């Protein structure tokens, strides 16, 4: 051990070319053997070479904190702070220090909350991503074990197999050549072949084969590590960030317009004094900007991401949450996702093709062509049929094992029997095994008949073949292959798959089965799961189908209507995703293998299922840690709840901006009312503190896929904000210009006086604006009536605490610096009552906006035909014709005729009409059977009588 540091020092300084010297010299220089390192030696080398990972630059905590004050919304607040001490310094008054301090305090509070929450979210995300850290099979102390790739050191012996991402730079040892995808490193588009002695780079992907290798470089010393130092990381602006920017810009522009109008009217027209004008501008700046928006939305997303992880879905990309919320098509693997991937073989159904061989011998041959360790589901099922798994290698000596790969779709074992004769046995996809057989033409028809018979019962087929190798060399082709038998494999559906698919459809997510199995198996599984049997072979994707009923349909439409596809290869998955995206669908795709990576990357939401390969996980947006489809649907619901919280807040933020800008601008310009800027700061601080709790609010997920609709957000915000602004103007008019409130409620008057002391009026306006503005969140957070959908207790508690503080300030505060005076409990009660009355129509306004934006209201206004026709059921014939046409087209009986549909009608609406018609018919039938009134009406209709002339009473 004494000489090791010097030798390893040479390796550390890269003075030895380990990539090109002979493999034996590699072992000599690394002071290791083919039996691997000991755990002690590995630990010593870890202290020399460091962990096998790229160290990220540590960001300064202080600079990160300041970064939260560096965005367009914060810039506006910072401009307001400068205005408070620089511009608001005239008219015989000192600078507005209280507003300056208040603004800075508000900025610090928001930045602190953002910093703490993002730091917590970052720590949680790091812990979650640690669960996804790549693993490596490494030989230590003479035993193979799975370790984190980060603890690999030069000299370790590792195992590389299909789907693995190479964990470190290494030299290959004896074994079959690998197909390595180095496109991420070298730009080579095609996989390259690497044999024994060749070097492989960290970060490349194994596309085919299995082999052992010796690690020669780790961490920053790898080819990938050196390249990473030369490249700066790039931050891609996501859709979420664009939406955030758009909403922020809308609010800033609204404030700018209000300020420009105020400047034009106050100074050139009204000839107002300088200082009051600046104060009014500060009110719009401070009150209108949604300074908490980045914090609220980021915190909501981070908390939601953590909740998803608890449900078994780890989000690698935060913005995948909003895409998951909008997903309307999910292309799901069958095996392992819709089914258990726990295969069973019915020995009684085994179909033997070779003479003199029984079912037990077939099982033994299939077991020999299986792995004893590190098994897949098929290996487990086959070897599990033996009385003792050791029987699979009993009496033979293994020479060479060919692992499964997507190209050959089979495994094979070359072995020596007790007499020293060499044999080879193979199992795999029936077509591949059949192609090996020397008598393929004689048995092909029978093989396909058996396969179809199995498939009709939902059983997969596994072929087994055997050959002798008289040459006695593992490289030799051997004698003729003999097709031995077909084994039936049954993969039972998950107990919750059918219910989950039904839930998905109710949520507007269409689940399509994507399977590599036969069409008949796909249809049988679809039938059992209740997802439909409208499935097609993969040849239909290429327009090569011979089925005349679907040959006339465009491929895009075929994919959109299909319940699934069978016989699918990874390249077909990519095509399916591309076509669905072209039809404006938000598409999710599940995958587990290395060849699924392109489709997972192409999909809007790539989902790596439980036990997926490193390559699939790397390409995905979401990694599942639990098996089954139910995890995905639960993640969809959670994502929609997260999205709903963000959407609720953005509508609220826009509403408050419009409400503050329009309301205070009108008060300033009509009655020359100067509201104290400091009180707007108090409103902002209390509002922001309360609104932070919306990230944990109880919400109802949307029943349909969600997406950012900026027109809806802006329209709803402008209308609700405009309504609240007008109610404040009306309240001001009633309190200032009339004696309505004193006459009705017996409170002191706030009417206009000779001195026009606005102090009490300012307190009244403060309380009116504060309470109704914050109460608006209960309207924007609910889809139906706000008093029906129960909010989270934290939000309710925060609201009442904030408004209790606001009420106490309005009742008791006599702050000369803020120009307010207490109004007493009488006025406080009047204002709360006024705001309750103001609150009631908000839900109705929300419903009207939603109805108007849906387009249906405009159809009625523009067409005007329904209102003026004498027909009782206008357009009934056209609707019936459209529905019948849609049904015939959906079942492939008729080519779609675009002329028959109006611009506002589509297949989905017609299908919905059809479903509603079915439900109405069923309700009518049950009503006729089970109610006396229904029975009487049925008889009257059947006899052709007029019910008005029948003088008898009946009971409902």
Curated annotation (Swiss-Prot):
Residues involved in Mg(2+) binding: 592, 596
Keywords: ATP-binding, Cell membrane, Hydrogen ion transport, Ion transport, Magnesium, Membrane, Metal-binding, Nucleotide-binding, Phosphoprotein, Translocase, Transmembrane, Transmembrane helix, Transport
GO cellular component term, pick one: plasma membrane
Pfam families noted in UniProt: Cation_ATPase_N, E1-E2_ATPase, Hydrolase
The enzyme's E.C. designation: 7.1.2.1
Active site per database record: 333
Protein name: Plasma membrane ATPase 1
Organism whose genome encodes this protein: Solanum lycopersicum (Tomato)
Lineage: Eukaryota, Viridiplantae, Streptophyta, Embryophyta, Tracheophyta
Protein's gene: LHA1
């Amino acid at each position: 051990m004494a000489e090791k540091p010097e030798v390893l020092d040479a390796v550390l300084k890269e003075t030895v070319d380990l990539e090109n010297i002979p493999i034996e010299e590699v072992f000599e220089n690394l002071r290791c053997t083919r039996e691997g390192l000991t755990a002690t030696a590995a630990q010593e080398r870890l202290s020399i070479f460091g962990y096998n990972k790229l160290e990220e630059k540590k960001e300064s905590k202080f600079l990160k904190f300041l970064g939260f004050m560096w965005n367009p919304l914060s810039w506006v607040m910072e401009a307001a702070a400068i205005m408070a001490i620089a511009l608001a310094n005239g008219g015989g008054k000192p600078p507005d220090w209280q507003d300056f301090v208040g603004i800075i305090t508000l900025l610090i509070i928001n930045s602190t909350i953002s910093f703490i929450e993002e730091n917590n979210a970052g720590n949680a995300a790091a812990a979650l991503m640690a669960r996804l850290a790549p693993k490596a099979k490494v030989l230590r102390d003479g035993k193979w074990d799975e370790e984190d790739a980060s603890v690999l050191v030069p000299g370790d012996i590792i195992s590389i197999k299909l789907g693995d991402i190479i964990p470190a730079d290494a030299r290959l040892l004896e074994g079959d050549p690998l197909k390595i995808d180095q496109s991420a490193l070298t730009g080579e588009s095609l996989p390259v072949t690497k044999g024994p002695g060749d070097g492989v780079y960290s970060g490349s992907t194994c596309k085919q084969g299995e082999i052992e290798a010796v690690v020669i470089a780790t961490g920053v010393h790898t080819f990938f590590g050196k390249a990473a130092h030369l490249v700066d990381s790039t931050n891609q602006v996501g859709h979420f960030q664009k939406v955030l920017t758009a909403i922020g810009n809308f609010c800033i522009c609204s404030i700018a317009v209000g300020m420009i109008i105020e400047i034009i009217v106050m100074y050139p027209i009204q000839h107002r004094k300088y200082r009051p004008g600046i104060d009014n501008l500060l009110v719009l700046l401070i009150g209108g900007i949604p300074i908490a928006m980045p914090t609220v939305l980021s915190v909501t997303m981070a908390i939601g991401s953590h909740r998803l992880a608890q449900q078994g879905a780890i989000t690698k990309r935060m913005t995948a949450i909003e895409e998951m919320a909008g997903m309307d098509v999910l292309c799901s693997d069958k095996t392992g996702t819709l089914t258990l991937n726990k295969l069973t073989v019915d020995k009684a159904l085994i179909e033997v093709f070779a003479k003199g061989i029984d079912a037990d011998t077939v099982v033994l041959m299939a077991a020999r062509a299986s792995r004893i360790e590190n098994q897949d589901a098929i290996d487990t099922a086959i070897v599990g049929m033996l009385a003792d798994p050791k029987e699979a290698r009993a009496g033979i000596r293994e020479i060479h094992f060919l692992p499964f790969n997507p190209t050959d779709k089979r495994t094979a074992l070359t072995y020596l029997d007790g007499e020293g004769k060499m044999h080879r046995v193979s199992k795999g996809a029936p077509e591949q095994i059949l192609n090996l057989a020397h008598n393929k033409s004689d048995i092909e028809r029978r093989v396909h008949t058996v396969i179809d018979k199995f498939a009709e019962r939902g059983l997969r087929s596994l072929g087994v073949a055997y050959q002798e190798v008289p040459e006695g060399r593992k490289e030799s082709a051997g004698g003729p292959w003999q097709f031995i038998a077909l084994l039936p494999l049954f993969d039972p559906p998950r107990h919750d798959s059918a219910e989950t698919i039904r839930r998905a459809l109710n949520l507007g997510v269409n689940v399509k089965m994507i399977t590599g199995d036969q069409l008949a198996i796909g249809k049988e599984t679809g039938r059992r799961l209740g997802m439909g049997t409208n499935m097609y072979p993969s040849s239909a994707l290429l327009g090569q189908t011979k089925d005349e009923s679907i040959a006339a349909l465009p491929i895009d439409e075929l994919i959109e209507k299909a319940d699934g596809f069978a016989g699918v290869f990874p390249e077909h998955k990519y095509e399916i995703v591309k076509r669905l995206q072209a039809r404006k669908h938000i598409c999710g795709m599940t995958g587990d293998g290395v060849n699924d990576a392109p489709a997972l990357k192409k999909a809007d939401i790539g989902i790596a299922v439980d036990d997926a390969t490193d390559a699939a996980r790397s390409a995905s947006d979401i990694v599942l840690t639990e098996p089954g489809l139910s995890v995905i649907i639960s993640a969809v619901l959670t994502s929609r709840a997260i999205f709903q919280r963000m959407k609720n807040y953005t509508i609220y933020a826009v509403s408050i901006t419009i409400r503050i800008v329009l309301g205070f601008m009108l008060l300033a310009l009509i009655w020359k009312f100067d509201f104290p800027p400091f009180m707007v700061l108090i409103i902002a601080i209390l509002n922001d503190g309360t609104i932070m709790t919306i990230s944990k609010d109880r919400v109802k997920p949307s029943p349909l896929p969600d997406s950012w609709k900026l027109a809806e957000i802006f329209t709803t915000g402008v209308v609700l904000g405009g309504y609240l602004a007008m109610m404040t103007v009306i309240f001001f008019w009633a309190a200032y210009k009339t004696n309505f409130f004193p006459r009705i409620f017996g409170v002191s008057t706030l009417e206009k006086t000779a001195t026009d002391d606005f102090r009490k009026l300012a307190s009244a306006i403060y309380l009116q604006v504060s309470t109704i503005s914050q109460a608006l969140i209960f309207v924007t957070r609910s889809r139906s009536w706000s008093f029906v959908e129960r909010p989270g207790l934290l939000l309710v508690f925060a609201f009442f605490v904030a408004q209790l503080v606001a009420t106490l300030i309005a009742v008791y505060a006599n702050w000369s610096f803020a120009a307010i005076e207490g109004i007493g409990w009488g006025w406080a009660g009047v204002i709360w009552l006024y705001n309750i009355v103001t609150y009631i129509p908000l839900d109705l306004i929300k419903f009207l906006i939603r109805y108007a934006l849906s387009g249906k209201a405009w159809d009625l206004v523009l067409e005007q035909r329904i209102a003026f026709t004498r027909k009782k059921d206008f357009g009934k014939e056209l609707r019936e014709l459209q529905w019948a046409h849609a049904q015939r087209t959906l079942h492939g009986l008729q080519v779609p005729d675009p002329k028959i549909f109006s611009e506002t009608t589509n297949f989905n609406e017609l299908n919905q009409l059809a479903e509603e018609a079915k439900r109405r018919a069923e309700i009518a039938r049950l009503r006729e059977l089970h109610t006396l009134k229904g029975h009487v009406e049925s008889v009257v209709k059947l006899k052709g009588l007029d019910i008005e002339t029948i003088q008898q009473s009946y009971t409902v």
